[in-house]
Amino acid sequence: MRKECHPLLRGGRKDNKFRQGFSSSEMESLASICEVILPPLPMDALKIKKHDDVSIEDVEFFWNTSASHYPIPHEVAEILSKRSLIEAVILIRVVLWLLATRLGTFLLCGLLCFSEKWPFINNFSSMSLKKRERVMQWWLKNRFITPIRLAFAYLKVLCLFAYFTWVDENGDNPAWKAIGYEVSADEKLPNSSNGRLLEKGIVETMHETNSTLQQSLTEKGLNVTLDSRNNILKVKCDAIVVGSGCGGGVAASVLSGAGHKVVVLEKGNYFAPRDYSSLEGPSMDQLYETGGILASVDSRILLLAGSTVGGGSAVNWSACIKTPHEVLKEWSENHNLSLFSTSEYLSAMETVCERIGVTESCTHEGFQNQVLRKGCQNLGLKVDYVPRNSSGNHFCGSCGYGCPKGEKQGTQDTWLVDAVENGAVIITGCKAERFLLENNRNGSGRKKKCLGVLAKALSSRVTMKLQIEAKVTISAGGALLTPPLMISSGLKNKNIGKNLHLHPVLMTWGYFPESTSELKGKIFEGGIITSVHKVPSRDSNSYSDTRAIIETPSLGPGSFASLCPWESGLDFKERMLNYPRTAHLITIIRDKACGQVTTEGRVSYKLSAFDKENMKCGLQQALRILKAAGAVEVGTHRSDGQRVKCGEVSENEMAEFIDSVCPMEGALSPGENWNIYTSAHQMGSCRMGMNEKEGAVDENGESWEAQGLFVCDASLLPTAVGVNPMITIQSTAYCISNRVVDYLKRDQI
């Protein structure tokens, strides 16, 4: 790893203390489950050939080790207790408690727990490894005990994520050598990126105390007074922006550029390029919402959302695709939102692309994008280069953990830099609790007026609340956080928290041995998304001209293992040995169905039949592309490990296999097989509408209920975009921010 990085991104448990609260019997059951998921195996069980750059000693170590070894079960319990929904915690603890008893083991495992020796019935941890594996294989497919299946799926994800992302104080994991993974040690950063570009505008509450915070804020040019009776710091400014991502960063820049004093609240921390470690585990923990392990309430979908200065733009995969014409037409005509048919919006897209340095070329593509491009070309399919907010020769597979080279131009490197230069102040480690609302008496038609935000620092050393009073308040926390904040503030519009679109994702994979493929590289090397194939719609009256888009993902070993199907311990270890050459393609759909998020951390969502059909078409096309690119084996992430070896079947059999592929429901569904979906794009949960029946905010982004409260993030988009939405979010935010500037001008008259 890079020698210099931020302590929070370095890895290695600092205090060696676990505080998950699990009993010793529960931990014993958990460790025995972890052992089944990733067991120790004899070397004679190894059936596949190791890769040339991997030593037999490294493979032997990996083959003999187990996920039951300290500290993995404790890490799993820690993640579970701190990051998971309460229902999941209760379910899993009940299962672990039952498995710690003989009667409970009999209820969950049946006759396999019987023994010839006294007391004749074993608890789970006393059963042989072989019998425990048979039990978990039964759980995997059993349609009558789906809660147990869900518990297994949850533990499988956490166990494998913890095992393959755990690092010591030196940033190393001994299993990585066996699977051919390494973290880039590139220390050469551009001179412009060596410093902290936002330093003069940042107040980091994790470094503050009650006695220092007021002085730090005052030194940044803010009007601060102490209300010692109520233990509140009162801050006055022109505009308060909650969130620093694609929407908040743009808003802060535009408003401060118009001469207004802006304060940005960000609950995450600030990291400069030199701070990034490219370590999957510590980076996910610090840079993503809920440490990158945020699941829907039924655990069907895992959601990725940024939680750091720069928000999603700091950790996204660089794709910069303009809003499709068909989408703009739909929003302007079907939703009567004239903004999206104006030259103002088209001009905003150009301004955004120029500010974040979008380029449309790619000098050298990484392995997975080579696979996508070659497969499409061999099939005669159109494949496009994806514009990125980096240079054409940017060859970095670590941008999902923050770009260590400082080339990717997130808001923390662009819009927020402009804002700080214009006097904006960014307060990190500070979470908004509610908007400050009062009854509106000025006859604007809105019942409430927003006066600012009440917030709290997340550092235990700062116990004072912050009451930030402003002329305008902008909510830019993203589609998962803006609705709960508005609802907790007392707003009632029925659209708040509804209409949530996720761009659901399923993956397909193909294995390309180095000895049989002309495509070079490993899946974690090179630009993450540089190519895209659009699966066209055959119906001119369809919801979209494109049924699905096919791109490539960023998959560190922890994410790869978490999403990969588990059939047995042996099969899984063999899959991991093939990790660096197992190319993945993601199928993303423009979902017509929508979910809801009205309480923080609780997302409900279900695909429609229309969406499933589009997903099926995308998955099948992705498999054809992988085969055409030269994969020797292809498959999906369906729970039963659905796959086929390309050279061992006829063309007709291959076609039959591909035609059989379709998306499944989640682990709680009654079917034998199931899927885990992912989502990195959340939109529409506080959508713009022509009236308060159609949306939560108007065409200017202002709440229909509260004067002076604006939304400026992905939540105000009317529908799903259908492509990577960063340019759409920033362009919409740019237009909304300029309208907020106009609002402030009118307010001064």
UniProtKB/Swiss-Prot annotation:
Q: Which Pfam families match?
A: GMC_oxred_C, GMC_oxred_N
Q: Where are the transmembrane segments?
A: 94-114, 144-164
Membrane topology per the entry is:
Multi-pass membrane protein
**What are the annotated GO cellular component locations?**
membrane
The residues the record assigns to binding FAD are 237-252
Q: Which GO terms describe its molecular function?
A: flavin adenine dinucleotide binding; long-chain-alcohol oxidase activity
Q: What induces it?
A: Down-regulated in leaves and apexes by cold stress, but no changes in roots and hypocotyls.
Q: Which InterPro entries match?
A: FAD/NAD-bd_sf (IPR036188), GMC_OxRdtase_N (IPR000172), GMC_OxRtase_C (IPR007867), Long_Oxdase (IPR012400)
Name assigned to this protein: Long-chain-alcohol oxidase FAO1
Q: Which organism is it from?
A: Lotus japonicus (Lotus corniculatus var. japonicus)
